[in-house]
């Protein structure tokens, strides 16, 4: 792993566009994305670069220009840049290779994607095979990670609650199975009021087929993972999968449920006894009336 740190910085200022001379992304072992916002807070520029350390100050003279707040993800020695939303987006996924000896980003290849379909993460499932979920399209692309060519597709649209996509979010591979949470959200990017549950697609990484959809309905948790946040799904020291669920982000006083659900090691089903709704748990060190929701 070459990424000792990945830092996102937001600079609250307006500025004129720089025109650096063929930026190559710099040199170093720390990968940094910086975002310069315009006064409206909804537009601006982002930059990606390597730096030798994270002390002192840096500028963007060697940084690679990105779309505004483009998601960036590192997998082994590959760095993937995903498209942002909107009319100015680059509708492709770019992959750079990190040269460990030179400490440089090299060999950019890219794969075109449909506009505004929100591919935001990539999960490696074999030596050259990876899965890319498309949040608004309701499919998972099967991709050759070396050539960045699409080799197949997994259709998840039949599992949507109401609209055309179940919103496949951020998944994890365990024992040859890809566990992919489905957010099942409405046009306001919030859970359906009549569908407060957690759905996960269980996909065989050898056949690329959906084995089943598992659902946890007991806790009334919902919105399992966000597609850009890789640490919302993880395995613990027992190899149990835990999935963080945001619900309504605490914005609905009548529905504050948020917490974790669990798929234990050796099982492909939820264990509801390990579900944990944290809305009523006082955070140690805070006022006794302060709750996570």
Question: What is each model feature region?
Answer:
Residues 243-247, 251-293:
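Long, well-ordered mid-to-C-terminal structural blocks that present hydrophobic/aromatic surfaces
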């Amino acid at each position: 792993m070459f990424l000792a740190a990945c830092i996102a910085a937001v600079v609250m200022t307006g500025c004129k566009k720089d025109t650096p001379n063929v930026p190559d992304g710099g040199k170093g072992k720390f990968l940094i994305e910086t975002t310069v916002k315009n006064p409206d807070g909804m537009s601006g520029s982002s930059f990606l670069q390597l730096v030798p350390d994270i002390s002192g100050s840096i500028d963007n003279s060697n940084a690679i220009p990105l779309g505004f707040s483009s998601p960036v993800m590192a997998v082994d020695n590959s760095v993937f840049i995903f498209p942002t939303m909107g009319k100015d987006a680059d509708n492709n996924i770019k992959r750079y290779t990190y040269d460990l000896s030179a400490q440089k980003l090299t060999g950019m290849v890219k794969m075109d994607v449909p506009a505004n379909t929100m591919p935001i993460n990539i999960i490696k499932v074999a030596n050259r095979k990876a899965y890319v979920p498309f949040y608004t399209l309701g499919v998972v692309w099967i991709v050759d990670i070396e050539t960045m060519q699409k080799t197949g597709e997994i259709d998840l649209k039949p599992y949507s609650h109401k609209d055309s996509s179940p919103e496949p979010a951020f998944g994890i591979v365990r024992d040859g199975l890809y566990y992919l949470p489905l957010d099942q959200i409405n046009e306001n990017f919030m859970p359906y009021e009549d569908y407060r549950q957690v759905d996960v697609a269980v996909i065989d990484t050898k056949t690329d087929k959906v084995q089943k959809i598992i659902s946890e309905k007991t806790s009334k948790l919902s919105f399992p993972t966000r597609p850009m946040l890789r640490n919302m799904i993880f395995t613990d020291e027992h190899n149990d999968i835990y999935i963080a669920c945001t619900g309504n982000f605490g914005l609905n006083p009548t529905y504050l449920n948020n917490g974790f659900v669990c798929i234990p090691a050796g099982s492909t089903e939820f264990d509801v006894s390990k579900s944990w709704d944290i809305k009523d748990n006082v955070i140690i060190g805070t006022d006794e009336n302060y709750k996570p929701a």
